[in-house]
Swiss-Prot record:
GO terms for cellular component: ribonucleoprotein complex. Residues 256-272 have a biased composition (Basic residues). Residues 160-174 have a biased composition (Pro residues). This is Protein LSM14 homolog B-A. A motif (TFG box) lies at residues 367-387. The gene is lsm14b-a. Belongs to the LSM14 family. May be involved in the storage of translationally inactive mRNAs and protect them from degradation. Plays a role in control of mRNA translation. It comes from the Eukaryota. PROSITE patterns: DFDF, FFD, SM, TFG. Keywords: Developmental protein, Ribonucleoprotein, Translation regulation. It comes from Xenopus laevis (African clawed frog). Gene3D superfamilies: 2.30.30.100. InterPro entries: DFDF, FDF_dom, FFD_box, Lsm14-like_N, LSM_dom_sf, Sm, TFG_box.
C-alpha cells in the first residue's frame, strides 16, 4: 500500500467544511466511494475559525474515522511515514506478536504493514459497522482500553476507574488484523459528516454503559490483559458487546405493531355482532356459448302440456247453470258440532266450474287446514314472541311514550275536548 500511495502512514492534518481540524495517520484512500480513512485520530475543534457552530477540542483518540471527500476542505501532510521495521512479506507467516512497548514509541508502520492476508480497510470497517449501528453510521471508534470503547461515557459524563490513554500494546494489532482476514468484503456505506459524529458520541457511550450495568459485569473484569508477550488487546473486536444496544435503540424508535383482529367491533354495530366475513366464491367457468337451437329442439311444448294435464286429471268443462249458488270450497266451514263439512268437489277433483268458482289447486285442503290457535302457536314457535306485548299497562314507554297505561291519557284528551281546552 505504501508503494502505491506514498502518503500512506503519514501524519495528516485535515480540516472539514465545518472548520473542524483533525489529525491522524493516513490509512486508506477509497477512490470508488470518495472517502479518506485516518487512524489514531484526534479532534482539535474549530480553533477560532469562522463558523456558525464552533466546536471545542476533544481529548479522545479515535481508532479510525472515515471522512467523506466532498466534506473535506483542506489536507496537509504534517510528518512523512516512518521507516518500516516489520516482517518481510512471507506467506508462511500466519500470525505474529510483539512484546509490549512503551506508549511513547509509536510504530505506525507495524499495523499498516502490507500483509497479503490482511483485509482492506473497508472490510474492517464493515465488520464494525454491522455490529454497532452508531459507530457504523458515524464511522468512528474510540481508542483506549476495551472498557472505554464498550462503555465510553467515562470521558464525557463521569470519571472512570481506568484512565483513557493510548495502548502500550499497539504493535499487537497485526494478529487481530490477520484474524479478521476471513470476513467477506462488504461495501461500506457513506457515513454522515464527522462533526455530527463527534456530537452524538456521548449518546452512544451512555447507551453502551447501560448495557454493561444491566449485564451486571464490573468494569474491572473487562480490562486489558497485559501479562505476557502473547497479550492481544483486540480493540477491533470490542464492538460485538454493543450489539444489544442496537435492539434497544431500534425498539424505542420503532412504531408499535398494529393489532389485527377479525372480530373487531364498530360503533354503528350492535353489541356482540361481529364483522361479516366475505368469502370469495369461485366463478363458474363455461366451456362454450349456449346453444339455443339444441335447447329449443329438446323443448316440446305440446308434450309438456299433455303431461301436465295427465297429472292434474282435468275434466271436461260443463256449462254453468244460471242461478246456481256458488260455494267456496277453499274456505273451511264447520257445523254446529264443530266438524268440518264435506268437500263438494270431491277428494280427487281440483276444479269444477259447475260446482264452485274456486279451485283446490292453490288452496289447502280442509284436512290440512289449521285453526287460529294452532296457527298462532306455529307463528310463535317460528318467529318468537312479538315485541308489542311488552308495552302493556303498568310498563314504562306505553302508548305515546308516557308512563303507565294509555287509557287515562285518552280520558284526559276527551275531557279537554269537552271543555274546549284542546
Amino acid at each position: 500500500m505504501s508503494s502505491g500511495t506514498p502518503y500512506i502512514g503519514s501524519k495528516i492534518s485535515l480540516i472539514s467544511k465545518a472548520q473542524i481540524r483533525y489529525e491522524g495517520i493516513l490509512y486508506t484512500i477509497d477512490t470508488e466511494n470518495s472517502t479518506v480513512a485516518l487512524a489514531k485520530v484526534r479532534s482539535f475543534g474549530t480553533e477560532d475559525r469562522p463558523t456558525d457552530r464552533p466546536a471545542p477540542p476533544r481529548e479522545e483518540v479515535y481508532e479510525y474515522i472515515i471522512f467523506r471527500g466532498s466534506d473535506i476542505k483542506d489536507i496537509t501532510v504534517c510528518e512523512p511515514p516512518k521507516a518500516s521495521h516489520a516482517l518481510p512479506q512471507d506467506p508462511a507467516i500466519v500470525q505474529s506478536s510483539l512484546g509490549s512497548a512503551p506508549a511513547a514509541s509509536y510504530q505506525p508502520s507495524v499495523p499498516y504493514s502490507p500483509f497479503r492476508g490482511m483485509p482492506t480497510y473497508s472490510q474492517l470497517a464493515a465488520t464494525s459497522l454491522l455490529s454497532q449501528q452508531y459507530a457504523a453510521s458515524l464511522g468512528l471508534e474510540k481508542l483506549g482500553s476495551p472498557t472505554a470503547s464498550a462503555g465510553a461515557s467515562s470521558s464525557c459524563s463521569s470519571p472512570s476507574p481506568q484512565p483513557v490513554a493510548p495502548e502500550p500494546d499497539v504493535p499487537a494489532e497485526p494478529p487481530q488484523l490477520s484474524q479478521n482476514a476471513g470476513y467477506p468484503s462488504i461495501p461500506v456505506r457513506k457515513s454522515p459528516m464527522v462533526e455530527q459524529a463527534v456530537q452524538t458520541g456521548p449518546l452512544e457511550n451512555q447507551a453502551q454503559k447501560k448495557v454493561q450495568q444491566a449485564k451486571g459485569a464490573p468494569v474491572g473484569q473487562r480490562g486489558v490483559r497485559q501479562s505476557g508477550p502473547q497479550s492481544q488487546p483486540a480493540p477491533l473486536n470490542v464492538p460485538p458487546p454493543a450489539a444489544p444496544v442496537l435492539g434497544t435503540i431500534n425498539d424505542e424508535n420503532r412504531r408499535p405493531p398494529r393489532r389485527r383482529s377479525g372480530n373487531r367491533r364498530t360503533r354503528n354495530r350492535s353489541r356482540g355482532q361481529n364483522r361479516p366475513t366475505t368469502v370469495k366464491e369461485n366463478p363458474i367457468k363455461f366451456e362454450g356459448d349456449f346453444d339455443f337451437e339444441t335447447a329449443n329442439a329438446q323443448f316440446n311444448r305440446e308434450e309438456l302440456d299433455k303431461e301436465f294435464k295427465d297429472k292434474l286429471n282435468f275434466k271436461e268443462e260443463k256449462p254453468e247453470k244460471e242461478g246456481e249458488e256458488k260455494t267456496d270450497s277453499g274456505v273451511e266451514t264447520q257445523n254446529s258440532d264443530g266438524n268440518p263439512e264435506e268437500d263438494p268437489l270431491g277428494p280427487n277433483t281440483y276444479y269444477d266450474r259447475s260446482k264452485s268458482f274456486f279451485d283446490n289447486i292453490s288452496s289447502e285442503m280442509k284436512s290440512r287446514r289449521t285453526t287460529w290457535a294452532e296457527e298462532r302457536k306455529l307463528n310463535t314457535e317460528t318467529f318468537g314472541v312479538s315485541g308489542r306485548f311488552l308495552r302493556g299497562r303498568s310498563f314504562r314507554g306505553g302508548f305515546r311514550g308516557g308512563r303507565g297505561s294509555a287509557a287515562p291519557r285518552r280520558n284526559q284528551t276527551t275531557q279537554r275536548a269537552g271543555t274546549g281546552r284542546v
